[in-house]
From Swiss-Prot:
It comes from Campylobacter jejuni subsp. jejuni serotype O:2 (strain ATCC 700819 / NCTC 11168). NDH-1 shuttles electrons from NADH, via FMN and iron-sulfur (Fe-S) centers, to quinones in the respiratory chain. The immediate electron acceptor for the enzyme in this species is believed to be menaquinone. Couples the redox reaction to proton translocation (for every two electrons transferred, four hydrogen ions are translocated across the cytoplasmic membrane), and thus conserves the redox energy in a proton gradient. It catalyses: a quinone + NADH + 5 H(+)(in) = a quinol + NAD(+) + 4 H(+)(out). Belongs to the complex I subunit 5 family. It is found in: Cell membrane. It is a multi-pass membrane protein. Disulfide bonds: none annotated. InterPro entries: NADHpl_OxRdtase_5_subgr (IPR018393), ND/Mrp_TM (IPR001750), NU5C-like (IPR003945), Proton_antipo_N (IPR001516). NCBIfam families: NDH_I_L (TIGR01974), PRK06590.1 (NF005141). This is NADH-quinone oxidoreductase subunit L. Keywords: Cell membrane, Membrane, NAD, Quinone, Translocase, Transmembrane, Transmembrane helix. Pfam families: Proton_antipo_M, Proton_antipo_N. Its EC number is 7.1.1.-.
Length: 596
């Protein structure tokens, strides 16, 4: 079993090393195939361990006092490993098609392999320090992949934005880990959680808050949310991987993994739930008006992450993990479908300039319809089951304000999901392109995700039974909630269909103040640029001038003065002085030797 766990972890790393050998060579398709097979091997091992349902620890060596280099294989880590493995395998095979004509083909697969390895390292680690190493690894890889086409300044800026914003949040997480080590004397999960109740409550509040700040950055929660939509600059398979299985799900995983700590600080947990509810409706509102195909799906990710944090914040950690898993399947399906549309439309992303794509892209349209139905939470698709449980638990736990916000967000989710479908596939064509369906390998790569987007929800009971060894089972099913959620989703879908079929919204709506507010992301990016980025740039300019005209000149003056002194000392008439210095130095050296 331990060998299988290590194979699962290191297979993507081997893929990274293999592809790196060809990184500077011309495109070789076998590189993509071998890397994809290695990641598939990792997924197979993870799934085998999942079905065996055997928890164990792999301890390799001690880093330093209180921290071992090891991995915990339990229900939580195996669930994450399996989700990461399945999605990563599909994305790898899909990338063979998507990146076929890119000169960086080999390098792309190297980065993908390292990305998957870092995420697996994160979820398998048995201590907070190992988690942080994987955490920084996915941050680095996201920077490499978002800025993969770095010659484009916009893409490069988006990569830097994601990297810097995550580094700011990671500082909070690092402080939390340091404080936890000072309080507990260890960072190993089992040891920390066993002594958690004996730790000072105020210290726990500080630790939990700092850890969540890190989670906010990685999972793009407000106010660290702006990087997520801009990260769409990267290749579409990267978007699928970041939004479905790696990177953004790491923050949710951290809160679930540290559930023992968060149970002891309900005040922090409740703030997490409130923030999640706010982000759910905040992101959904922006997705209503966005014209960029990938950004719509990105905002839907942000909204669904809000749902997950609501569940985790209210203590329903198993439900949060269930929604994380189901969301991974239909979200990656949607992103890969968007990749097919982009490929057919010569990389155009404006959905207002699409339409009429159902006939030429029939299979892609069906796949994206399935993904959208799951995202909207319509029965019997996967999203219905997991989202319904989050709504149900917020209702039965008497957090009716949060429930109402999530219900409105569910309505908005259905609306923007079907708005996307209508404008892309089912309204008259508004373009001059000659679109064609994606290759068979791309469609085959999407097939497992399609199946899971349909059936994953039906494994609800077996999923929670499997998790019962690590997380408390909560029965959150409620008939009233189920009816309300279904009605909200169906109404949202029907309204979008009729609105865009009958052209209810004219172009003049874009002049509306509310529309401008939403389409400009509530002007938050502009606020950041004007009051933070521009001020930082001004400070940098001042420091640059100080460096050039003050510090550099001081150094030059010191160097010139030293040069003049040295020249005087080596003049022939200074030989007597030099001999005196030599004798004095020799005497001092003898005294030091004698003292020793």
């Amino acid at each position: 079993m331990q060998n299988l766990a290590l194979i699962s972890l290191f297979s993507p790393f081997v893929a990274f090393l293999f592809a790196s050998c060809f990184a500077l060579s011309e495109k070789k398709q076998f590189v993509g195939i071998i890397c994809s097979l290695l990641v598939a091997l990792s997924a197979f091992c993870s799934l085998y361990l999942l079905f065996c349902n055997e928890a164990f620890n792999v301890s390799l060596f001690e880093w330093f006092a209180g921290v071992n280099f090891g991995f915990d294989i339990d229900a939580i880590s195996l669930t994450m490993m399996s989700v990461v493995g399945i999605v990563a395998t599909c994305v790898h095979f899909y990338s063979i098609f998507y990146m076929a004509h890119d000169e960086g083909f080999n390098k792309f697969f190297a980065y993908l392999g390292l990305f998957v390895f870092s995420m697996l390292f994160l979820v398998m680690s048995d201590n907070f320090l190992g988690l942080f190493v994987g955490w920084e690894g996915v941050g680095l890889c996201s920077w490499l992949l978002i800025g993969f086409w770095y010659k484009n300044d916009t893409y490069s800026f988006a990569a830097n934005e994601a990297f810097i914003m995550n580094r700011i949040a990671d500082l909070g997480m690092l402080l939390g880990i340091f404080w936890l080590y000072l309080q507990a004397g260890t960072l190993k999960y089992d040891e920390v959680f066993s002594m958690a109740q004996s730790l000072d409550h105020n210290a726990l509040i500080l630790i939990a808050t700092c850890l969540f700040i890190g989670a906010m950055g990685k999972s793009a929660q407000f106010p660290f949310h702006t990087w997520l939509a801009d990260a769409m600059a990267g290749p579409t398979p990267v978007s699928a991987l970041i939004h479905a299985a790696t990177m953004v799900t790491a923050g949710v995983y951290l809160v679930i993994r540290a559930s023992t700590l968060y149970d002891l600080v309900p005040e922090v947990s409740y703030i997490i739930a409130l923030l999640g509810a706010f982000v759910a409706i905040f992101a959904a509102s922006m997705a209503l008006v966005v014209r960029d195909l990938k950004r719509i799906i990105a905002y839907s990710t942000l909204s669904q992450l809000g749902y997950m944090f609501v569940a985790a914040g209210l203590g329903a950690y198993g439900i949060a993990l269930f929604h994380l898993a189901t969301h991974a399947f239909f979200k990656s399906l949607l992103f890969l479908g968007a990749g097919n549309v982009m490929h057919a439309m010569n990389d155009k992303l404006d959905i207002k300039k699409m339409g009429g794509l159902f006939k030429p892209l029939k299979i892609t349209a069906i796949l994206m319809c399935i993904g959208s139905l799951a995202l909207a939470g319509i029965y019997p698709f996967a999203g219905f089951f997991s989202k319904d449980l989050i709504l149900g638990y917020s209702f039965i736990s008497f957090h009716h304000g949060i429930f109402l916000v999530l219900l409105i967000a569910a309505f908005l989710t259905a609306f923007y999901s079907f708005r996307l479908l209508m404008l892309v596939f089912f309204t008259p064509a508004r373009h001059d392109e000659h679109p064609h369906e994606a290759s068979k390998i791309a469609l085959l790569a999407m097939s497992p995700l399609m199946v899971l987007a349909i059936i994953a929800g039906f494994f609800e009971h077996s999923f929670f039974e499997y998790l019962s060894t690590k997380l408390v089972f909560i029965d959150a099913q409620n008939q009233i909630v189920m009816i309300c959620a279904s009605v909200a989703a169906i109404l949202g879908a029907i309204l979008a269909i009729f609105a865009y079929k009958n052209s209810w919204f004219k172009e003049s709506i874009e002049e509306n103040k509310i529309h401008k507010l939403l389409s400009n992301d509530y002007f938050i990016p502009q606020f950041y640029h004007q009051f933070i980025v521009s001020k930082y740039e001004s400070l940098c300019a001042i420091l640059k001038h100080c460096d050039l005209y003050i510090f550099d000149r001081i150094v030059e003056k010191i160097a010139l003065y030293s040069q003049n002194i040295s020249q005087k000392m080596i003049m022939p008439n200074s030989l007597n002085l030099m001999l005196r210095f030599l004798v004095a130095a020799f005497v001092i050296l003898l005294i030091l030797v004698w003292m020793v």
